[in-house]
């Protein structure tokens, strides 16, 4: 051991300095001077493990406070709060910006989040909605290169085409060959027994991950399920009077996250049920806009999703509802 190192070791390891000063000195070297923990250990005559523990003690005691000067700083804090509050596996909060359009930004964020969890050859189940279709558009290259397979969670071909239509022809895509909603519960039951419908729905219940949109009653005429013609404005008003705040896959939820009881539409839908969806390991909800806050909150407290991609203003509104 060099004479310099012996001198340093006697000085610091012998605790000639108060621990607070030692923490401060280690922090300065690490954050200000950009030294590695090994470099600091060499300089102060301390093992790397001791340096690591001093840095952690500094963070816990408040001696070290890291400030991130970025528009993403608030988003990162909100992600952490959402994960802790609702026990989420994934939380992604995007900055509140005017451009590009929100659904485009949400789609990009959801695509990036899914790229981090999907393994080659796995099966991704997809719900309808503008944000989820934007997600597929931005996942197209990844889906092709990693041979990720796709399956729809609900009937209805039209609402899926803006996303699926962007994929390479070689991509494996299974679509439920039936409408999202049919004229009666009896017709729905007959179609569910058809092997072509049943097999795709069974595949969807075995997916490795799912991405779904969250609709809101407060969207009024902007709601995808209304614009697609699956419900009428009169039905939308009736659902609201019965306590509905939003929907996932056409199933309408109350503020507490439970399905609204007694709605005929729930028996007329063709697709994976909410209970079946809940069995999947990862269910990422993609939604933004303050008018969707209550619907997102319902999905979270009802454990309908365990991942969320949203934007900053919406995240704050959701957390306000939870407080």
UniProtKB/Swiss-Prot annotation:
Broad class of the protein's primary localization: cytoplasm
Gene3D superfamilies for this protein: 3.40.50.1360, Winged helix-like DNA-binding domain superfamily/Winged helix DNA-binding domain (1.10.10.10)
GO molecular function, one term: carbohydrate binding
Keywords, in A-Z order: Cytoplasm, DNA-binding, Repressor, Transcription, Transcription regulation
Gene Ontology CC terms, in alphabetical order: cytoplasm
Ranges of the DNA-binding region feature: 37-60
Keyword Coiled coil included in the entry's annotation: no
Activation/inhibition comment: Inactivated by phosphorylated autoinducer-2 (phospho-AI-2). Phospho-AI-2 acts by binding to LsrR, which is then unable to bind to the promoter regions, allowing the transcription of the target genes.
Subcellular location: Cytoplasm
NCBIfam families per record: PRK15418.1
Similarity remark: Belongs to the SorC transcriptional regulatory family.
Task of the protein: Transcriptional regulator that represses the expression of the lsr operon in the absence of the quorum-sensing signaling molecule autoinducer 2 (AI-2). It also represses the expression of the lsrRK operon. Acts by binding to the intergenic region between the lsr operon and lsrR. In the presence of phosphorylated autoinducer-2 (phospho-AI-2), LsrR is inactivated, leading to the transcription of the genes.
Protein known as: Transcriptional regulator LsrR
The species this protein was found in: Klebsiella pneumoniae subsp. pneumoniae (strain ATCC 700721 / MGH 78578)
Organism taxonomic ancestry: Bacteria, Pseudomonadati, Pseudomonadota, Gammaproteobacteria, Enterobacterales
Gene that encodes the chain: lsrR
């Amino acid at each position: 051991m060099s004479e310099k190192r012996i001198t340093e070791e006697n000085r610091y390891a012998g605790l000639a300095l108060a621990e607070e000063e030692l923490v401060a000195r280690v922090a300065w070297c690490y954050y200000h001077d950009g030294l590695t923990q090994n470099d600091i250990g060499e300089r102060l005559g301390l093992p790397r493990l001791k340096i690591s523990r001093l840095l952690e003690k500094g963070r816990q005691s408040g001696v070290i406070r890291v400030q991130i000067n970025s528009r993403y700083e608030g988003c990162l804090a909100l992600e952490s709060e959402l994960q802790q509050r609702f026990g989420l596996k994934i939380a992604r909060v995007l900055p509140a910006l005017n451009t590009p359009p929100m659904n485009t930004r949400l789609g990009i964020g959801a695509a990036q989040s899914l790229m981090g969890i999907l393994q080659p050859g796995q099966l991704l189940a997809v719900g309808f909605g503008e944000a989820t279709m934007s997600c597929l558009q931005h996942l197209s290259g990844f889906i092709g290169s990693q041979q990720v397979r796709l399956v729809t969670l609900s009937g209805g071909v039209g609402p899926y085409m803006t996303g699926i239509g962007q994929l390479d022809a070689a991509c494996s895509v299974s679509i439920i060959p039936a409408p999202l909603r049919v004229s009666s519960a009896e017709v729905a039951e007959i179609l569910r027994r058809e092997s072509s419908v049943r097999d795709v729905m069974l595949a969807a219940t075995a997916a490795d991950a799912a991405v779904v949109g969250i609709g809101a009653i407060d969207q009024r005429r902007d709601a995808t399920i209304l614009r697609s013609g699956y419900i009428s404005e009169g039905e939308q008003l009736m659902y609201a009077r019965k306590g509905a705040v939003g929907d996932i896959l056409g199933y309408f939820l109350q503020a507490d996250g439970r399905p609204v009881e007694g709605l005929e539409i729930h028996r007329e839908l063709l697709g994976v049920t909410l209970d079946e969806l809940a069995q999947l390991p990862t269910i990422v909800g993609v939604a933004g806009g303050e008018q969707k806050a209550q619907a997102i909150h319902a999905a979270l407290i009802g454990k309908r999703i365990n991942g969320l991609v949203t934007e900053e203003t919406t995240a704050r509104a959701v957390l306000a509802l939870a407080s």
